[in-house]
Structure formats: C-alpha cells, structure tokens
Amino acid sequence: MGRIIGIDLGTTNSCVAVLDGEKARVIENAEGDRTTPSIVAFAEDGEVLVGQSAKRQAVTNPTNTLFAVKRLIGRKFKDDVVQKDISMVPYKIIAADNGDAWVEVKGDKKAPPQISAEVLKKMKKTAEDYLGEKVTEAVITVPAYFNDSQRQATKDAGKIAGLEVKRIINEPTAAALAYGLDKSSGDSTIAVYDLGGGTFDISIIEIADVDGEKQFEVLSTNGDTFLGGEDFDMRVIEYLAAEFKKSSGIDLHNDPLALQRLKEAGEKAKVELSSSSQTEVNLPYITADATGPKHLNVKLTRSKLESLVEELVLKSLEPCRQALKDADLTASDIDEVILVGGQTRMPLVQAKVTEFFGKEPRKDVNPDEAVAIGASIQGAVLSGDVKDVLLLDVTPLSLGIETMGGVMTTLIEKNTTIPTKKSQTFSTAEDNQNAVTIHALQGERKQASQNKSLGRFDLADIPPAPRGVPQIEVSFDIDANGILSVSAKDKATGKEQSIVIKSSSGLSDEEVEKMVQDAEANAEEDRKFEELVQVRNTADGMIHATRKTLVDAGDKATAEEKEAIETAITELEEALTSNDKEKIEEKTNALTQASGTLAQKMYAEAEAGAQPAEGEQAKSQDDAVDAEFEEVKEDKK
C-alpha cells in the first residue's frame, strides 16, 4: 500500500503534506513554494497552466484564467451567491443542462470538479516528485459547512485527478489534528476559527486522552461557504473601481483586463495593510477613452480597509455564537483558539476573535499549512502508520425528508457524530396509495422548499390499504466522509429501494468516468507536449551554438563546410515550424553531424594555441618575489 497524502484543496491556495517518518511534512512544489495558487488557465496553444504560472499570465488572459472555482463546486447556477459572483469574475459562469453552475472556456463547458481536478493533479505530482513513487490515494479536506453535493463533487474531482479519495475530512478538524497531536496529555476544548479564501468555518473540538488514545471529538460546527478572503478582495476592488469612476467617469466593470489588474492590486494592498498602516495602489494605463490613456492612483489606509470589511468580519462571529450554543458552552469554556486560513493574518480579524473569545489566539499554528498537515495525519491513521488517534466528526446540517404539507421531518440532527444511521417509520397520505416518493433534504428550515434538495426516489408496488396503514421505514446512513445513503422499505412486503445521494444535480458516474479518461488522455498529451518542448529547446540551442562556431571560425571554415552547415540550419529551422518531434530530432542530428568536423578542427587549434601560453605562465610564476605587506587603516570609519 502506497502513502496516503493529505491535500488542502483551498479556494485561493492549495497545499499537500505527507507523514515522513514521525512528522508530517508540507511538500514544496516545483517552483519551491509550500502552497500553490488554486488557479487554472487555458493558454492560446492549448496548454493547461496550474498554480503560479497560471497566476502570472492572468492579466493578459483574464477570460480563460479560472480562480476561486471551489465557490461554485456542487452549486446551482441560480443560487444567489453564484449570481453575485458572475459580475465579479472576468471568466464566464454558465448553467449546465442539469442546472449546476459550470464555467465556459474557449467555447468549452467545464464542470467545477474538472477544474479542481487540475489543481489536485498538480498536488499529486508535487507529492510524487518528492516521494519518488506513484501516489494513488489521498485524504482531501473540505469546509466543515459543505453540504452533501459539495462533498460528492470534491470526491469526483479527486477521481478525475486519478486519486482514490480515502476520506473527505473537515478543514477545522484537520487543523485540530495538526495542532493537538503533539500536545501534552490532558483534556482541552479548542475553537478552530477557519477563515480561508472562499469559505468560513468554526468548529468546537474536544481533545481528550481516553485509555492512552488521543480522541478528537467535534462538539459542533457552523459556518458560511460564501465568506472568505475573496470577499475581502471584492470590497477593495469595488472601492478602487468606485474611486476611479468618481475621478474619470469610467466604469471598469465592463473591462475584464482592468478587472483582473484591479484584483491583483487589491489583493496585494490587502496583504500589505496587515503589516503597514498605508499603501498606494498605482495602476498606469488601466484603461483609455477618447481623451487618451487613464491611470489609477489611490491611497488606501488600514483604517479605510477595515471600514470596508468590518461587516464581513462581524458576519463570521454569528456562526461562532451558534457553534458555542450548539455545543452547550460559553466562550470562557474554550481553552485555546486556533486561527486557520490566510485571511486570519488580518489584524482586524485577530482583534475581533480575541474580543469574542476573551483570549488571544495561538500563534504557533501556520494558518496556511495546518489543514494539509492534519489531512496527512488522517491519511497515516487510515493506512495504519499512526495509531492511538480517534477522530469523531459531525454532520454540519440536519438531514430529513419532505412529509405531508411540505414540511421537513428531520431524521438526523445537525452536529450528530458520524458515521451514523437513523430510521423512522412513515405511512401513506391517501387511501390505496401504491407508491411513495422519498425526497431527501438537508438544512435547518421547517419548510421543505427552503432546504437543499439532495435527491428523490420512488418506492412502488405498495399493497392497497387505507391511508396511514402501510408501514414504510426510511433509513438515513451517513459514512465517515459525510456522504449520505437513503433507503425506504415497505415492512409488509419487505420490498426495499435505496440510493446513494448523488444530489439532485452533480455529475453522473458516466460523466465522471469520461472526465477521468479525458484527464488520462490529457496527461499523455501533456507528456508529448513536454517532450516536444525539450526537443525544440535542444534544436534552438544547437542552432545558436553552431552560428557562434561559424562566426568564431571565420576563414578557417571552408566554403563547403559553411554551405553544408547553413543548409542544415535552414532545414532545422523549417522543421521547427512544425510539431513533428521526429523530424526536428532528425534535422538536429543532421546539423550536429554537419558542424561536428568544424567544431573538432576549432577545438584542436584552440588546444594547440593554449600549450605555449601555459609554459609562459609557469615561468612567470617562478620569477615571482614574495613581498611584505602592511595593513592600511586610513579608510576605516
């Protein structure tokens, strides 16, 4: 069994870790960074760029550069939060045939799990390069407040990337694992405040020593899957755009290129203001009108930034109140507060969290890496490399079915420890009813239509009977990933019908399988593309070196040699205009041969000319005289 890696698939950045001996280790990517931007770009030549390379070209390719796609995963196009996002991103968000939110790139419709899979592939490759072995299994983290369809979509992304997802684990729980595993014995209750790039979670977790086993029990969890650093960036972008409109009368919202530059500048300004009290946003040639080019220059102070985003920070405290209430605790019962997610570096966030919990958050947890480290520890628990650790997570939202009158009847309450199974008996609403529709729901509202619909199925062939007589047992079963199966059984006939909830939307098994095959085909294409680039680089280098040799040779090269070399160069340059790898290799070899004799002749002459010079040098060294020296200290200040 290979190693199980831990991946924090973030909205803004992703991170991969593995248990290396006794210690979990964050793995640096090919660029030498410990985190990778969760950005995927589709270049003009068809190449797929992931991470820093995608981020670097975002300004020149805004409509084909996809960021923060995690906010769309498992969501419907008509969701309010998706509609709000459409006007704020330069790329195109569209409705899929089943109503899901997808993206469109160069006329191609793509599902969010497909885009996330590109990021996961990069993390997989990063781990493989470090370990020197193939990686096929992973633990992937999700926001604790992700619903069933969002979890399922994340699992699909893993499958498309060629990973068997051994477990989906909640981000705050993973951070608690990273923090608590090496802490001294004794019981403690911690609050994990996780404000990342796109999502917010709060989890109250009890860490206890039970018979020598370290037990992490989630008491409650709450959050907002559309609140994060991206929203803070948006506030800055809106402010900069409004200031620019005030001074120039031009609305930058209609210009994707300007929007992308604003996004980069806004994010940079936000980060800078965590350590300084003022910064300047200077974007020359942001746009142009009939009077000529326009420049954006805005001073932004920390207090102005805080006034723009304070509402968002306060919005995060409501779930904290609810989580404490659900755990039946008060802020004073919390022993430690852990901050996770890059946005928690903001001084205002730290101040409000300190004020709310009445204690300073811990500073010894890396907010960018803790989640991936925790995921790798969970991977090691699953593979048996780490023992004496028990993780008890919860389902974040209540689960139930729609009953008469459009009411949601809850079977599993929110914050129930998982895995779990609950059953309840229902009956028919009309006389001689021969079928019932089971409509599974997730949420906290009493009105069924106000909750998230997870799926429907029918139980048919119920024997005719007066209403209320048939006994239909409905069972909800949640696995350790928080993914749900529902079954319904007619007690009289024993007939049973069940489904694994794939959500009323989501990707079908066939679609996922096709995407897996596409990804594998793309991997082969990528390999061929890489080989072609290497061959091209070798050819370019050969042309450059040969031309230099010709110049250096001057008259020493015969007319025949020059002609043969020039012909070989022309033929190789012609081959380079095609994508024919074999042809380029063949013409490179031909040039190597054509220039070989001249290169040898030049080398032999250079060698012959160097020998007398060496003799002279030796003689001059023999004549050297040792001299005394005196240190001069005049310049010493």
Curated annotation (Swiss-Prot):
GO terms for molecular function: ATP binding; ATP-dependent protein folding chaperone; unfolded protein binding. Coiled coil: none annotated. Residues 603-637 are annotated as: Disordered. Residues 623-637 have a biased composition (Acidic residues). SUPFAM superfamilies: Actin-like ATPase domain, Heat shock protein 70kD (HSP70), C-terminal subdomain, Heat shock protein 70kD (HSP70), peptide-binding domain. Keywords: ATP-binding, Chaperone, Nucleotide-binding, Phosphoprotein, Stress response. Residues 605-615 have a biased composition (Low complexity). The modification Phosphothreonine is found at residue 199. Induction: By stress conditions e.g. heat shock. Acts as a chaperone. Belongs to the heat shock protein 70 family. This is Chaperone protein DnaK.
